[in-house]
């Protein structure tokens, strides 16, 4: 808030934040941040890549779950992770989306996803909009995994989300554990 307060009123301001923080599993305080943005005439840019497909009545993410989608200006999401496809998107006012299409080098100098990928993404989004079963199963699996890790006495950081932050504390040991899980069990750990 101090940065917003120190910024001249007539200067454009953007608050960029995440709905689910990937390193520690915390949820972003979307409503609180949106209120702060309104108070200081800033726009909000919400990264929902760890929330879409997993949270909300139709899988639209944490902002949908919390009933605050109308308070966010721009939402960035992925068609990977919860939707199981490839690619990403932004949703927001047409003028913003047009500016990204016109000026963002990563958008301009890339190839559009192939039609089969788009068809798969559309089918996945449509299915998850009407089926809460996958979200329930995902939350159940996450809770069971958290319980198993805690029961094994592993240093799991408490998190409200589906992300399981397991603190190893030594990068060489962490890499060895990650390699073992992949080669011995087919589990990819990031």
What do these predicted ranges mean?
Residues 104-113:
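A short glycine-threonine-serine/GTX helix/turn-capping micro-motif
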Residues 112-130, 137, 141-144, 150-155:
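Structural motif of enzymes handling amino- and sulfur-group chemistry
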Residues 64-99:
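Active-site PLP attachment segment
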Residues 1-46:
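Active-site phosphate-binding strand-loop segment of PLP-dependent enzymes
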Residues 136-143, 150-185:
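Conserved PLP-binding catalytic core of the aspartate aminotransferase-like
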Residues 22, 122-126, 161-169:
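A short beta-alpha structural unit
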Residues 13, 76, 110-111, 154-160:
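Short beta-strand
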């Amino acid at each position: 808030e101090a940065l917003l307060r120190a910024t001249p009123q007539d200067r454009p301001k953007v608050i960029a934040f995440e709905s689910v923080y990937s390193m520690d599993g915390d949820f972003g305080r979307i409503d609180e941040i949106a209120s702060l943005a309104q108070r200081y005439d800033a726009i909000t840019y919400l990264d929902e890549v760890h929330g879409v497909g997993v949270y909300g009545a139709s899988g639209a993410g944490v902002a949908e779950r919390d009933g605050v989608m109308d308070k966010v200006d721009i939402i960035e999401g992925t068609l990977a992770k919860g939707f199981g496809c490839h690619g990403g998107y932004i949703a927001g006012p047409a003028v913003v989306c047009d500016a990204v299409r016109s000026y963002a080098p990563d958008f301009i100098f890339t190839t559009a996803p192939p039609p089969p990928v788009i068809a798969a993404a559309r089918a996945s989004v449509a299915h998850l909009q009407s089926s809460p079963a996958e979200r329930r199963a995902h939350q159940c699996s996450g809770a069971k995994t958290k319980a198993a890790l805690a029961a094994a006495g592993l240093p799991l950081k408490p998190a409200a989300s589906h992300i399981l932050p397991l603190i190893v504390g030594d990068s060489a040991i962490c890499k060895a554990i990650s390699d073992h899980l992949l080669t011995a069990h087919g589990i990819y750990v990031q």
